[in-house]
Swiss-Prot record:
The gene is colec12. Residues 95-120, 216-267, 377-408 form a coiled coil. Residues 562-576 have a biased composition (Pro residues). Residues 59-720 are extracellular. It comes from Danio rerio. This is Collectin-12.
Amino acid sequence: MKDDFNDEEEVQSFGYKRFGIQEGNECTKCKNDWALRVAIALLYVLCALLTIAVAVLGYKVVQRMDNVTEGMQNYGGKITAVETDLKKLDDQTGEKSENATSELHSFKLEFQTLQKQLSDVIVKTSNNRAVLKELQLAGEDMQSGHLSLRDLLESNANVISKVNHTLNTYNSLIDGLKTETARLQSDLHVQTSEQGQNSHSISTLNFTQTQQRNLISSLQRSVEDTGQAVQKLKNDYQSLQQVARQTKADADWLREKVQNLQALAANNSLLTRSNSDSLEDVTSQLTTLSEQVQNTSTITDSHDQSLRELMDQQRDHDNATSIRFDALEARLDSNEGEMDRITGNVSFTTQLLRAISTDLNGLRTCSETVTRHSELLHGLNNSVAETRAESTELKAQQEELAVRLDKEVSSLSIVMDEMKLVDNKHSQLITNFTILQGPPGPRGPRGDKGSMGLPGKTGPKGEKGEKGAPGDAGPKGEKGPAGPPGVPGLKGPPGSRGSPGPKGSRGSGGRQGPSGEKGDPGIPGMPGRDGQPGPTGPQGPQGLRGPAGPAGLEGARGPVGPIGPPGPPGLPGLPAPPIVVPPVDPQGFVNRQVAPPPTTTPGCPPQWKGFREQCYHFSAPMESLNFDEAKERCSNLSSSMLIINDEEEQLWIKRQISGKGYFWLGLKWKPGQPDNWSHGHEAGEDCAGLIHEASWNDFFCTERIGFICERTNESKVPVL
């Protein structure tokens, strides 16, 4: 279009000098003025006619060009409509066209890509047909599997009905066991009340026995004091006897020798009589003391006999209660075994039902995938049919556009040929005329703004942009079906030992032990001093020296000396066997625990046992605590609760606690664990403990059983 307008401007503004017509003196020489004027007028007329013709031709050309531009705009609108249709098709098929331009080459390329895509879709449909055939075969297999699963479900239903029947029977048995356990609990309550009465009577007997022991010890002390007094009296009596003998000898010697001393002898006889009276009083006191000692001995013998009878009765009662408790424990063990079998059967049935439910879920998902695939294939078939129809429509529209473009191009070529012919004619007509070039005319008004050109080619694909920010989190999906139980994990390594707790408060003082046996008698005292020499007699006449006589008789033994100091205390006697009252826990389990004997393991505190590099403290038989109290007690002992790490430690613990009841372990379930079975209670069994043969089980944390504390052996701690 621009070239055509430029040609018009050149036609309107070109000069005639190029045709050889020039202004000069030759025309004035050949022609006159009149001819010149006529020629000039004719030239003006011809110029006017030419301008009119050129204007008419320009108007026609402009009109034709307006028609052509309107047609091009219409074609552009149609092309944009085709592009929008192609974009819609791209949106429906999920593919994006990159080069959608107004050129035929781009249309051909797009149609080739569409043909390739159609061929790919045809290949995919053929593949999907094979997949459909495979899915049909799988569906047939699934139908057969459904039939087999139905048979399995029917068989499982029969098994479940049988299991329900057995559960009903077990329920009846459990009801009977509940009645028996209620009766046993009532018996246990009666026995506990009797045992409490017996313990009260035993405590009263122990109190009376301690009082009797105190009385006996006081009587023994009084007897010892009386014995010492009697010994002193005996010594005095012997000294008095010696004095009496001496006085008798003196009296005889005086009767024989001196008569004038009769008054003195009479006085001496009075003195002896008074001494004999005092001796008689002492003997009467000794007889009364001996009678009192005999009475106390008879009373102590009667008390000892009653205590022996009470001990025998208590021993018989303990034996009977232990036998009954053993029978109850055996029955409870059998009941626990039956309950374990029942729970095993129930768990097996639940596992079967879970497996069946997982299979059904898998079948359901398979059927859903099959239906989804069938819907997708149906949608693909519909989309393929639509793409085929649209491709045929596009081909028809393309052919029509090609025909129209060919017509328009041919018409434009004809117009251009006509314009060239007109230009040639104009050039031929103007060859014989000289046209003076006039002054340039005024600038014409600005033309209207042309129509918007066609869109250019699509540029190359840009670089990949940066990754956008993550979108908002989607809504939480529905909870999926519970998966099958996983394989139990490996046992984790033992945790690091905690820091030792603060030192516990000092325990209460123990009971006073029984008094020891009577010590051995002391060493006999030194022999008494010799008696006083008698009064010197009158010197007789010196007789003749006689022969040496025989040796005289041995003199009388002197009086017994004072009692020596008491000897060292004797060795402590054997302690009496403790009276063990078996505690009863809230569920009726009886703890038959025996106090472990004290050990002297190096590096371990007293009453602790050593094994390898650890020290263990076993609770006393009467010491039953719940889990939190046991944990606090172990922390007060600068230790922690027992955690078994290997089989050797478990075997050693098994040997130590055999027949001693249940003990706490330092393990506890987390909230919501699978084995937190409530068993008809509000809270679950969250704490672990040791039962028969050192096997562990979960208990209620409020139960009161024994506990075991452990700590490192101080002698085996490496020195840094």
